[in-house]
Swiss-Prot record:
This is Macrolide export ATP-binding/permease protein MacB. InterPro entries: AAA+_ATPase, ABC3_permease_C, ABC_transporter-like_ATP-bd, ABC_transporter-like_CS, MacB-like_ATP-bd, MacB_PCD, Macrolide_Exporter_MacB, P-loop_NTPase. It comes from the Bacteria. The gene is macB. GO terms for molecular function: ATP binding; ATP hydrolysis activity; transmembrane transporter activity. One of its GO terms (cellular component) is plasma membrane. GO terms for biological process: response to antibiotic. It comes from Burkholderia pseudomallei (strain K96243).
Length: 653
């Protein structure tokens, strides 16, 4: 590289202050070559710290150009800037900016974690750096157990972890006693002698006197830039930079390392606030316990009821043409007619009967065309099927007799044809070009397996036969067995009557077994209802997780700034807080499942008719649900953390 290592050209930095902007740097041009040791001197408020932040890619110019090794920083994305900070810059802060819950060696390792270095290599280099700086016996100590000078040396070691081509020292002696300050300056000079570019930001002329180049700044402008002939060259300490940098691990290993670091930091954060963590998990625990227990109770109740009702008959029977399901001759059999339905309806064991015939036809209303199942039925159809109308009325015997052009539609058809119109009664629709007046809308019936999406229209069977289908025979007959009558006996009598009328067995019957279906549907609906109530507690728990994570982001803003300064990407920060949220939810989910098994034991003490039945699917779903809650409700806090400005984050206490 032939040009300067760092070059600013007419750089200006403004900050908004009310309706006006405050100019902190004004038209600054500056170049620094590799291997220089430079002091930037100025009073408080002169703009020297802002200049250092721009040099270290923690901040960006409002206008002008800044290049690092010939690369224009304004063209770089946030992750590319993080890579520059991680691989080229090392920061030494006046306030040290060490993470209090990590030991000295772990603080030094941090830049290498985000560089993707292998764990063993980064620990070896961290210990070597601390040893060269006289802290080998303090590697396992936390910052609170170190003196100010020792903390600053840890900060220097951290700056060198990834090589530290450029060392940026912001008032490195400002918080130290004179002896510790001299030691820090000595180390910086030794690093410069080893080839590191050292930039010292200070207001102390005595500190600046150790630099071979002094740049003076005042009111955001450079007012002096001179060489210092009185600065002595330092002798390089042979191993002051700690030896070889740790090699970057393979992509997979690097990703695993960063994830492990995120999990470890999440665990430390959770353990350090035990009560808050427990209260955060409480909503998740209650929700998971409720969902798993309710599903287990519902499954146990269903099995018990199915065992109990066993062979109980049902009250609805269908009659179809043919020998059985799939009979290829069924379409050719035309002996099932409306008179059969009338004869069945007259039997003492039958409550009601309805003929049925159906086709898929095109419906049209104004400019809306849809395909629907059009069924021709008798006036007792809705009674037989137990269907209720949400609007209007059903057609009666008179409409059936005179082939009236009237129709009853279901709710799905109403939505498709009429959209936002809540009252389609009296509207005329075309059924295969036959105009029919809508006289009723059936109420929605939800299946235990979900909402039925098909479209249904019912017209008098005489209208269907004479005006739409052009056929006299029926597709089926549905009868409802009178209450109190044995379903199997009714089926036998029905079969006998039909044989007498047809003279041969050209039909078959199907007993709907409605009791079993009703029990299953009721059990599933009840389980669903109670599960939804439990899910509400899960959502509340998730909101609690989000609130606590937002608080955690606020509390750890400075930590986020430190991590960004040493090279953490936005994705690294987001991953850390997402892992923390998911960890909370998974722990809550695990505790909830354990409590569910405990509830099973208590349940068996009070209810002996059936027992709770757990399934692997419900337990796996609980863990999946916990993970999803952690991701969904942890996303916003994690995103907020990743979008923090490094300078603003570092400035917060």
């Amino acid at each position: 590289m032939t040009g300067p290592l760092l070059q600013l050209t007419r750089v200006t930095r403004r900050f908004p202050a009310g309706e006006k902007d405050v100019v902190v740097l004004d038209d600054v041009s500056l170049s620094i070559d590799a291997g220089e040791i430079v002091a930037i001197v100025g009073a408080s408020g002169s703009g020297k710290s802002t200049l250092m932040n721009i040099l270290g890619c923690l901040d960006h110019p409002s206008s002008g150009s800044y290049t690092v090794g010939g690369r224009e920083t304004s063209e770089l994305e946030s992750d590319e800037l993080a890579r520059l900070r991680r691989e080229h810059f090392g920061f030494i802060f006046q306030r040290y900016h060490l993470l209090p819950h990590l030991c000295a060696a772990e603080n030094v390792e941090m830049p290498a974690v985000y560089a993707g270095s292998a764990q063993a290599q980064r620990r070896e280099r961290a210990l070597a750096l601390l040893a060269r700086l006289g802290l080998s016996d303090r590697a396992s100590h936390r910052p609170s157990q170190l003196s100010g000078g020792q903390q600053q040396r840890v900060s220097i070691a951290r700056a060198l972890m990834n090589g530290g081509e450029v060392i940026l020292a912001d008032e490195p002696t400002g918080a130290l006693d004179s002896k510790s300050g001299r030691d820090v300056i000595r180390v910086l000079r030794e690093l410069n002698a080893l080839g590191h570019t050292v930039i010292i930001v200070t207001h102390d002329e005595q500190v600046a006197a150790h630099a071979r180049r002094i740049i003076e700044i005042s009111d955001g402008r450079i007012v002096g830039d001179r060489l210092n002939p009185h600065a002595d060259a330092a002798d390089a300490a042979p191993d002051a930079s700690g030896g070889a940098q740790p090699q970057r691990a393979r992509r997979l290993s690097a990703g695993v390392g960063r994830f492990a670091e995120a999990f470890r930091m999440a665990w430390i954060a959770l353990v350090s606030h035990r009560l808050r963590t427990l209260l955060t998990m409480l909503g998740i625990i209650i929700g998971i316990t409720s969902v798993v227990s309710i599903v287990a109770i519902g499954e146990g109740a269903k099995r018990y009821m199915l065992d109990e009702i066993g062979s109980i008959g049902t009250n609805t029977i269908n009659v179809y043409p043919g020998a059985d399901w799939g009979d290829s001759r069924a379409d050719a059999i035309q002996t099932l007619v409306a008179a059969d339905a009338a004869a069945l309806a007259d039997q003492i064991y039958i409550d009601s009967a309805t003929p049925e015939t159906s086709r898929s036809l095109l419906l049209r209303y104004r400019n809306v065309d849809v395909n629907a199942l059009v069924s021709g039925v008798g006036e007792r159809f809705f009674q037989v099927r137990g269907m209720k109308l949400a609007q209007g009325i059903a057609f009666g015997a008179d409409e059936v007799r005179r082939q009236a052009q009237v129709a009853v539609i279901d709710e799905n058809t109403r939505r498709k044809l009429f959209g936002a119109n809540p009252n389609p009664l009296g509207e005329v629709i075309l059924i295969d070009n036959l105009p029919c007046v809508v006289i009723g809308v059936t109420a929605s019936k939800k299946s235990a397996f979900g909402d039925m999406k098909n479209l249904n229209v019912w017209v008098p069977y005489t209208t269907a036969s004479g005006r739409l289908f052009g056929q006299r025979h029926l597709d089926s007959i549905t009868v409802r067995v009178r209450d109190g009558q044995p379903s199997d006996a009714a089926e036998r009598s029905l079969t006998k009557l039909m044989l007498q009328r047809h003279g041969r067995k050209d039909f078959f019957t199907y007993n709907m077994d409605s009791v079993v279906k009703t029990v299953e549907k009721t059990g599933q609906s009840l389980t669903l209802l109670l599960s939804l109530i439990a899910v509400i507690s899960l959502v509340v728990g998730g909101i609690g997780v989000m609130n606590i994570m937002l608080v955690s982001v606020t509390e750890r803003t400075r930590e986020i700034g430190i991590r960004m300064a040493v090279g953490a990407r936005q994705t690294d920060i987001m991953q850390q807080f997402l892992v923390e949220a998911v960890t909370v939810c998974l722990m809550g989910g695990a505790i909830g499942i354990v409590l569910s098994f405990g509830m099973s034991f208590v349940f068996s003490l009070f209810v002996d008719q059936w027992k709770m039945v757990f399934s692997a699917a419900s337990i796996a779903s609980a863990f999946l649900c916990s993970t999803l809650i952690g991701v969904v409700f942890g996303f916003m806090p994690a995103r907020n953390a990743s979008r923090l400005d490094p300078i603003d984050a570092l400035a917060r206490d």
